[in-house]
Swiss-Prot record:
Designated gene of the protein: HIS6
Entry's localization field: Cytoplasm
UniProt-recorded name of the protein: 1-(5-phosphoribosyl)-5-[(5-phosphoribosylamino)methylideneamino] imidazole-4-carboxamide isomerase
Organism, scientific name: Saccharomyces cerevisiae (strain ATCC 204508 / S288c) (Baker's yeast)
Keywords, comma-separated and alphabetical: Amino-acid biosynthesis, Cytoplasm, Histidine biosynthesis, Isomerase
UniProt cross-references to SUPFAM superfamilies, sorted A to Z: Ribulose-phoshate binding barrel
Length: 261
């Protein structure tokens, strides 16, 4: 059954909700921000832990976020996942407090070429059950979903399809997919992508798939549950009341999870 998954997005040391497609690596560029929290990251870590919202992730969007990430992880040790700048030199350090590490850009060269050997290396160090592979993507004009890196600004040579999941499941049992084109817009999920995620992974019972991007109603949990036959979990961000949104109540999402058991 589809579950609600929480997030803690960090930007310059603060908990924020950002429109995904507006993030860049340029210092002079300011991303479009939906919300800046007055609470520290540990506040949200405690909130998720107290309500037993399993599988939540802390994402470091750029530099100056390590302290805030540690604060969240140490508030709820071994409960939250962490991503952003994860590689083979720091993964074990983060796993002192995190349940899993989320890896993205490090799996690619600067030009966007996928490096399977890097994922193999990470699996050797951490174990496949402590790694989440982030396959966040953008949709191309010809209807394909291509994995995007560098704050979702650079398209890579890795396409989301059945072959990709078949190969990468050897090294991890969880994937996180942000639909970058709709992330932070509260304009609705990418229904076709959610359906495809089920189609591509339906034969792998042990594989966990988490989708993020565009969720705007608690009813989206039911929608994702139907589209993915319960295979895909759903992350809410900017639409949630705990992040300044007025479309979705955190309490309602928690009740959904409790009903699912």
């Amino acid at each position: 059954m589809t579950k609600f998954i929480g997030c803690i997005d960090l930007h310059n040391g603060e908990v924020k909700q950002i429109v995904g497609g507006t993030l860049t690596s340029k210092k002079e560029d300011v991303p479009k921000t939906n919300f800046v929290s007055q609470h520290p990251s540990s506040y949200y870590a405690k909130l998720y832990k107290d309500r037993d919202v399993q599988g939540c992730h802390v994402i470091k969007l750029g530099p100056n976020n390590d302290d805030a990430a540690r604060e969240a992880l140490q508030e709820s040790p071994q409960f939250l996942q962490v991503g952003g700048g994860i590689n083979d030199t720091n993964c074990l350090e983060w796993l002192k407090w995190a349940s899993k590490v989320i890896v993205t850009s490090w799996l690619f060269t600067k030009e966007g070429h996928f490096q399977l050997k890097r994922l193999e290396r990470l699996t050797e160090l951490c174990g496949k059950d402590r790694i989440v592979v982030d396959l966040s993507c953008r949709k191309t004009q010809d209807g394909r979903w291509i994995v995007a890196m560098n704050k979702w600004q650079t398209l890579t040579d890795l396409e989301l399809n059945a072959d990709t999941f078949r190969e990468l499941r050897k090294y991890t049992n969880e994937f996180l997919i942000h639909a970058a084109d709709v992330e932070g817009l509260c304009g609705g999920i990418d229904e076709l992508l959610v359906s495809k995620l089920f189609e591509w992974t339906k034969d792998y019972d042990d594989l966990k798939i988490v989708y993020a991007g565009g969720a705007k109603s608690v009813d989206d949990l039911k929608l994702v549950d139907e589209l993915s036959h319960g295979k895909v979990d759903l992350t809410f961000g900017s639409s949630l009341d705990i992040f300044g949104g007025n479309l979705v109540k955190f309490e309602d999402c928690c009740r959904w999870n409790e009903k699912q058991g």
